[in-house]
Amino acid sequence: MTGSAEETFEVARQLGESLSGGEVLALVGDLGSGKTTFTRGLVCGAGCADYARVNSPTYVLEQVYQGRVPIRHYDAYRLGSPCELDELGFQEALSSRAVLVVEWADRVESLLPADRLLLELSFAGVEREGEGPGDGRLLRFSSSSAAWAARLASLGGACADNEQG
């Protein structure tokens, strides 16, 4: 769990530092739950100096960020079918060195590889002493991959509550 957008960013930044290329991250959550904030942190951790320009590619459907490893950021919110993502070259991107981040991944699940990290983001309603309701988020990581489980365990903190299987 994170208590603010800054903490969500930091968890993602740490995860981004561990990326080596070719990974797929599937992000799921309501509007405003932090998917784009998480992606911004991930892009920062992957070494993109221009991470502050990361925004949701809802209308353009895909953004590409260059850093230590390239990141292809997709948004499936407006797609009518998974085929539309495939028309953007998603299958080709899967065989590239790029890290693929898909917001609203539940809408294109049939295109995603089994070896992916699923992140479900939800509102936590965290209250901090003297501050009232906060900007908290629950981050629920899951993957069938032992490699993802080990990576998340090494990060500790908000990533500690992950599931494998």
Residue ranges of each PLM-predicted region?
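P-loop (Walker A) phosphate-binding loop of NTP-binding proteins
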Residues: 28-30
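Conserved lysine of the Walker
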Residues: 35
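Post-Walker A helix-loop "phosphate-sensing" segment adjacent to the P-loop in P-loop NTPases
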Residues: 44-53
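Short phosphate-coordinating micro-motif centered on Lys-Gly-acidic
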Residues: 85-165
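N-terminal pre-Walker A segment at the start of P-loop NTPase domains
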Residues: 1-14
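Phosphate-binding P-loop
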Residues: 16-22
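Short hydrophobic/aromatic beta-strand immediately N-terminal to the Walker A/P-loop
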Residues: 24-26
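AAA+/P-loop NTPase substrate/partner-engagement loops
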Residues: 56-73
